[in-house]
Amino acid sequence: MTQDWDAGRLDSDLEGAAFDTLAVRAGQRRTPEGEHGEALFTTSSYVFRTAADAAARFAGEVPGNVYSRYTNPTVRTFEERIAALEGAEQAVATASGMSAILALVMSLCSSGDHVLVSRSVFGSTISLFDKYFKRFGIQVDYPPLSDLAAWEAACKPNTKLFFVESPSNPLAELVDIAALAEIAHAKGALLAVDNCFCTPALQQPLKLGADVVIHSATKYIDGQGRGMGGVVAGRGEQMKEVVGFLRTAGPTLSPFNAWLFLKGLETLRIRMQAHSASALALAEWLERQPGIERVYYAGLPSHPQHELARRQQSGFGAVVSFDVKGGRDAAWRFIDATRMVSITTNLGDTKTTIAHPATTSHGRLSPEDRARAGIGDSLIRVAVGLEDLDDLKADMARGLAAL
């Protein structure tokens, strides 16, 4: 027999709750079965009581699900939990991080609009703007991420959107989000921040003045390399446009992946703190090694934006990049000599990963575009996982010995 639960009942009143409580409980609704964990709704469609009920739901006259391309209870719980953690009015989940960017730009920009995108972004993001959005008549320029004067100078009367990663992939470059938001708003534009590297556990861009936050949930939100997904979170009328695009175009998140991400969120802050602590220790160790030319990690006092990172983030994240002496051949020898870390381009996993950005994530860019993004042949990116730090250092020492 089922228990006497109110279907759709919210888990509890969480107004004013702290981050860790929201990460565990926000958005959860129990079914009449009274389950304690989040229910997984693997259904494509929903049954209506009558023809009139179906018509009313499709017309939006009464609440309720009609089709999982539009809404799904498991996905909705994930969306509401992300919105609570980011301080957003609404969040909408997508099939991948790239589809989140697609939904954002296709929803908010039209042919003839102008978009400013940082040079310091993921290689596929550059390809999306350069190869595809330009086909639709959207103009794109790429100012340097941290040069606020360059952003202001690059604005045009038709500038609609600023898009940045902060910290950037893979060089951990930052922008003063509050200052950039002021410039964008003065020019009548919106600011979107890809918060993938920090997650809301370490940085909340909306509270700093950004209008929209983007995530690849595939990374630290999942945390264990299991599922793919993305999120757009924001405030105001722009989110209605994003929801409308996603319901029509269809790059929606699978319920199973939403359920995985809910499990990941429960340990998000704990994991990000552990990732950050190990990454900082590894960056400090690498900086002392003779085979390393430069380390890119905002937690290091030597990083040119260390103080900015301390001001707008509560931690420095898991990604440590560094240049080895000797160019591409040396970088490949370093990578191939490791025995524990995984050679893969994904990040955000409990397992440490290592990659050569110039020939993987940024490999499809022209040499000129890679140079503008600061991606050299000697660069290695390590996304620090949750293994023992001494074991990780020992594996990096194998790489150093191969130089």
Swiss-Prot record:
Any one GO biological process: 'de novo' L-methionine biosynthetic process
Top-level EC class: transferase
Keywords attached to this entry: Amino-acid biosynthesis, Methionine biosynthesis, Pyridoxal phosphate, Transferase
Catalytic activity: O-succinyl-L-homoserine + hydrogen sulfide = L-homocysteine + succinate
List of residues that carry N6-(pyridoxal phosphate)lysine: K219
Metabolic or biological pathway: Amino-acid biosynthesis; L-methionine biosynthesis via de novo pathway; L-homocysteine from O-succinyl-L-homoserine: step 1/1
EC number, as in UniProt: 2.5.1.-
InterPro entries for this protein: Cys/Met-Metab_PyrdxlP-dep_enz, Cys_met_metab_PP, O-succ-hSer_sulfhydrylase, PyrdxlP-dep_Trfase, PyrdxlP-dep_Trfase_major, PyrdxlP-dep_Trfase_small
GO molecular function terms attached to this record: carbon-sulfur lyase activity; pyridoxal phosphate binding; transferase activity, transferring alkyl or aryl (other than methyl) groups
Cofactor: pyridoxal 5'-phosphate
Recorded GO CC terms: cytoplasm
Similarity remark: Belongs to the trans-sulfuration enzymes family. MetZ subfamily.
Assembly with partners or alone: Homotetramer.
Function: Catalyzes the formation of L-homocysteine from O-succinyl-L-homoserine (OSHS) and hydrogen sulfide. Cannot use the other activated form of L-homoserine, O-acetyl-L-homoserine, as a substrate.
Descriptive protein name: O-succinylhomoserine sulfhydrylase
Organism, as annotated: Pseudomonas aeruginosa (strain ATCC 15692 / DSM 22644 / CIP 104116 / JCM 14847 / LMG 12228 / 1C / PRS 101 / PAO1)
